[in-house]
Design a protein with these regions (language model features):
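Conserved SAM/AdoMet-binding glycine-rich loop
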Residues: 1-133
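A structural motif corresponding to the C-terminal lobe/cap of the Radical SAM core domain
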Residues: 72, 84-202
Length: 202
């Protein structure tokens, strides 16, 4: 049967559930991916982006591993390498949990020996409210550990309507945001070049 309301009542961790609003049967994201791969052979390459690390279960990794037309590309934003900053962002995971997910993803999906390496991408925000130099250095360490092929790095800017804008003072000076942003960009540029050379070597 058709997949209905895949965005509601969906769990990345396990079996089917029901939409509490419509009473319809829904599927997991892993099930949806597998179904599209199997039932729509005309799609030559399947790729999805911007995954929330807290909800990314092994079932999704296994579907990607076992489905040759699903790209082994994961864009999983970290936003910061500091647990204090992540808590202020209300991200719902720690640096340690995030890195553990990257390790699991690599264990499942990085198979250069069969020409199927895993490519990782991330997002980082520099100068989030309350970010200290220690927090900034922790984010540098995260970049070194994560070894993204590419990472989208931006200076924080307050956005009306967001919790950060309403509740957190934008207390990192613009010059400091700019310096930290440039340092992270330079570091990621080096890492991207190194990862690119590793891919060529594989």
């Amino acid at each position: 049967g058709a997949v209905t309301q895949p965005q509601k009542g969906c769990s990345a961790k396990g079996g089917h559930s029901r939409d509490p609003f419509a009473g319809e049967r829904v599927t997991t994201f892993a099930g949806l991916l597998s179904m599209i791969h199997e039932r729509v052979p005309g799609i030559q390459r399947l790729r999805f982006v911007t995954s929330y690390p807290r909800d990314f279960g092994d079932d999704v990794l296994e579907v990607i591993r076992d489905s040759p037309r699903i790209c082994r590309y994961l864009h999983v934003p970290a936003q910061s390498g500091s647990n204090a900053v992540l808590a202020r962002m209300n991200r719902g995971y720690s640096v340690e949990e995030y890195l553990e997910f990257l390790d699991r993803a690599r264990a499942h999906l990085h198979q250069p020996e069969i020409n199927r390496p895993l490519t990782l991408a991330g997002d980082i925000i520099a100068g989030f409210p309350g970010e200290t130099e220690d927090d900034h250095e922790a984010t540098k360490r995260l970049l070194e550990r994560a070894r993204y092929k590419n990472c989208f790095i931006f200076k924080y800017s307050a956005r009306p309507g967001t919790v950060a804008h309403e509740k957190l003072p934008d207390d990192v000076p613009e010059s400091v945001k700019r310096r930290r942003n440039n340092e992270l960009l330079a570091l990621q540029q080096r890492i991207s070049a190194e990862v690119g050379r590793e891919f060529v070597g594989e």
